[in-house]
Amino acid sequence: MLKLHPSIDNGFPPASPGFAGGTLKCKCASNPVTVRIGSQTAHNHACGCTKCWKPEGAIFAQIAVVGRDNVNVTSGAEKLQVVDPSATIQRYACRDCGTHMYGRIENTKHPFYGLDFVHTELSDETGWSPPEFAAFVSSIIESGVNPESMPEIRARLTELGLQPYDCLSPPLMDAIATHIAKQTGALPA
């Protein structure tokens, strides 16, 4: 069987009704960074971009969003560093193990400002929103995946119920376009 990501390869459970979040933990055996997520996540997806953190051997990352006011570093804050200060999403990673703990957009004019990006697979709790789609699928080629494998990869994503896109899902692309249209005056604010 084609391996995409350990949290999606064998299917995934549905979200638990009333699930209110949990704690993410980096891969350090001692003194791990922990981040409390205070609510359910949304727009969970497999991501093929080369910026997102992936566990060892994974082709895709698994990433979801949550309101930034629901993200709280509870231990190890001194170990966090921004991976690429020039990136739109400031990805905070543990400097010891390299695990990305959360990503934050600081540009208040960005359509996704106020949402943080998190890897729910770093939590021991169950009940998180499941992945809904696969984004930036073609980008896995940039990380070394053979382009000839793409039809098989897209077929496997589809088999898992994850519609493959080479951008974000249509509702997220609509949200971006709506935000821009309101900023430019093409739509009322």
UniProtKB/Swiss-Prot annotation:
**E.C. number(s) listed in UniProt:** 4.4.1.22
Kindly list the positions annotated as binding Zn(2+) 1: C26, C28, C94, C97
Keyword Lyase, does the record have it? yes
Pathway listed for it is: One-carbon metabolism; formaldehyde degradation; formate from formaldehyde (glutathione route): step 1/3
Give me the residues that bind Zn(2+) 2, please: C47, C49, C52
**Catalyzed reactions per annotation:** S-(hydroxymethyl)glutathione = glutathione + formaldehyde
Note the InterPro entries from the entry: CENP-V/GFA, Formald_GSH, Mss4-like_sf
Which Gene Ontology MF annotations are present?
S-(hydroxymethyl)glutathione synthase activity; zinc ion binding
Keywords of the record, alphabetical order, are: Lyase, Metal-binding, Plasmid, Zinc
Q: Which Pfam families match?
A: GFA
Q: What are the recorded Gene Ontology BP terms?
A: formaldehyde catabolic process
The family classification in the record reads: Belongs to the Gfa family.
- Functional summary from the UniProt entry: Catalyzes the condensation of formaldehyde and glutathione to S-hydroxymethylglutathione.
Which protein, by its recorded name, is this? Glutathione-dependent formaldehyde-activating enzyme
The species this protein belongs to is: Rhizobium meliloti (strain 1021) (Ensifer meliloti)
Gene name in the database record? gfa
